[in-house]
């Protein structure tokens, strides 16, 4: 997760949320 700001509430990268790539984001979180 280097180079990304992580949302501590979800553990997801903020950039994922901004791009709307929720499925990809969830995989990255896990």
UniProtKB/Swiss-Prot annotation:
Summary of the tissues where the protein is detected: Expressed by the venom gland.
Record GO cellular component, one term: extracellular region
Pfam families linked: Toxin_3
Secreted recorded as keyword: yes
Domain LCN-type CS-alpha/beta: 1-30
UniProt keyword terms in alphabetical order: Ion channel impairing toxin, Neurotoxin, Secreted, Toxin, Voltage-gated sodium channel impairing toxin
GO molecular function annotation: sodium channel inhibitor activity; toxin activity
Gene3D superfamilies: Knottin, scorpion toxin-like
Locations listed in the record: Secreted
Known function: Binds to sodium channels (Nav) and inhibits the inactivation of the activated channels, thereby blocking neuronal transmission.
Description of its domains: Has the structural arrangement of an alpha-helix connected to antiparallel beta-sheets by disulfide bonds (CS-alpha/beta).
Family statement: Belongs to the long (4 C-C) scorpion toxin superfamily. Sodium channel inhibitor family. Beta subfamily.
Protein name (Swiss-Prot/TrEMBL): Neurotoxin II.22.5
Lineage of source species: Eukaryota, Metazoa, Ecdysozoa, Arthropoda, Chelicerata
